[in-house]
Amino acid sequence: MRRLNRKQTLIFFYAFDIVLVIAIALFSIPFSCSSRSTLESKDESMLDPANAGSVVKIELRNHKTEKSVVISREGSMWIGTDSNSNNILKWPCRKNLPESFIAEASRKIHMVNKARNSKSHENFSLEKGNCLEVNFCGPSGEIYSSLFFGDKNAVTKKICYRTFSSNDVWEIESHIEDFLSTDADFWVDPYIFPQCVTGLSDQESSSLLRHGKLAYVKPSPSIKPLKVFEKNFDNTAKGIFSFYEKDGSYIVIPMFTGGISFSEDDSDAVKSLSYRYSISQLTYKKFFEREEK
């Protein structure tokens, strides 16, 4: 057998070392990925379930559009206001919607870490001027959870978020995105006779007339309403509805007082409602056909 000279021997051992290093590196990749995956994922809720029952205010702000909605619990009711009226006009929330939002935020979900520094926030639409902010607040003004949400990924259908106190970006698959709206019409009770006033269930209210979009207008004191209608509900609550004609449709301004079974806080809540909304000519006609028969 031919013996290798010194130079050939060194080349052989160098080549063997290189192959060995590559083999070790390739062999360790699955373990590295597995370990990294374990470290970068977790099952956690965005809102501590222990605080869920104490949430009395939810703030939503879209930093891209500068629109905001604030929902507050007053008595047993949820009352909303929004930036379109400079948070002046108050409207009743859609029944059970705030509770469903809180429940979804406090549900434990699977999260995967996508980034760990603020420089990556722009890649996920999570920088301060481009995200949607949600704050869940307690009775003393404390913020239980401050969250920032980016855009939904068109491919994975998932959404990323971060918290106020951390730069970590987490990707989640959650129904939380169903509630991430600063459109007041999404949150407002859709019925002309709101459920917080009537006390009716969803099934009982399903046949009631619905109103159109919220209106941010203030009729001049010199303009008298076209019609004023008073409604006494079965629970002894009362509503007064003023109808104004505008551009082929109608603007309705309701006022309410609570019934005898209402707590003081609930009575104050319904009395504070100051919203107004539009209805179509058809809805106007149906309303008086039903109520004046």
Which residue ranges define each predicted feature?
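Secondary-structure "cap/kink" motif recognition
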Residues: 1-293
